[in-house]
Amino acid sequence: MEKYFFSKNYKETKSAGNKAKTDIEEILLTNGYKNVGIRSNYKGSLMGFIATLLSLLKACLSIQPNSVLVLQYPLKKYYTFLCRIAHLRNCEVITIIHDLGSFRRKRLTIEQEVSRLNQSDYIIAHNDAMKVWLQEHGVTSKLYSLGIFDYLSKSTPQPNTNKDQYRVLYAGALNPKKNPFLKQIGAIIKSYKFNLYGSGFEAQNKFNDVINYKGFVPSDKLISAAEGDFGLVWDGDSISSCSGELGKYLKFNNPHKTSLYIRCHLPIIIWSKAALAPFIKE
């Protein structure tokens, strides 16, 4: 029995979502899985589209009967196509979920997403909360919980020698829609410093000298030189709870920044109602 996974064009590999996907591909390769797609990094939409189509063609020609195919979800319209090709050849499909479109971007209804996912034989959800949510909304595939994403890096965290104020580190995509709470947090910081890493933060959002915007730093460099004593996992429009659609998503989602913080050897501050809160406490 052959073991496969499908790779495609990634416009960039520095984002949390694509880093998680490429890490999983590396892990699958080391465990004897073969790539039936073509991994590429074209930034242009046209070249990226052509590269992904070539990946699909290669997959159609490469998948052997009675094999196993691992897909990383979401995969847009290609997901259903690949599931059907695999099942026509009596293959089993294992789906690793990275994001749920019906939650985050609202591009799919819950019914549409459940219908897609039910084309997989096995599904690996982020955690038990996501697993239960999928079951309650009609997913009939066999479900398993990941626990937490791996974070591959050759970098080594340096010993923390900070003896001054505690420093809270927040890393990720910084934009008003995803983390509007950042506009409020500067006003309440009294006894610690707040270091922001990522792109999209406007200079005028700096409220006082305790907020230090570091800009975008590649993850390998951040791991070896993180300026923080704690890593913050938070989304939404409030500093008292993770409210709003993206904030509520933390009840089911495993933010990849959590894995990054662990890789940086940072203790984690997280919303008590987040799906990962029990894992952090444990």
Residue ranges and their predicted role:
Residues 51, 100-115, 152, 250:
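Nucleotide-sugar donor phosphate/pyrophosphate-binding loop at the beta->alpha transition
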Residues 151-224:
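Conserved catalytic-core segment of nucleotide-activated headgroup transferases in glycan assembly
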Residues 105-108, 119-143, 274, 278:
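A short, active-site helix/loop in glycosyltransferases that binds the activated sugar's phosphate group
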Residues 223-263, 270-278:
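Nucleotide-sugar-dependent
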Residues 46-52, 87, 91, 139-144, ...:
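Active-site regions of enzymes building and remodeling cell-envelope glycoconjugates
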Residues 35-38, 122-125, 145, 168-171, ...:
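Short, hydrophobic beta-strand segments that form beta-sheet elements in well-ordered domains
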Residues 6-11, 71-76, 100, 126-128, ...:
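Structural motif
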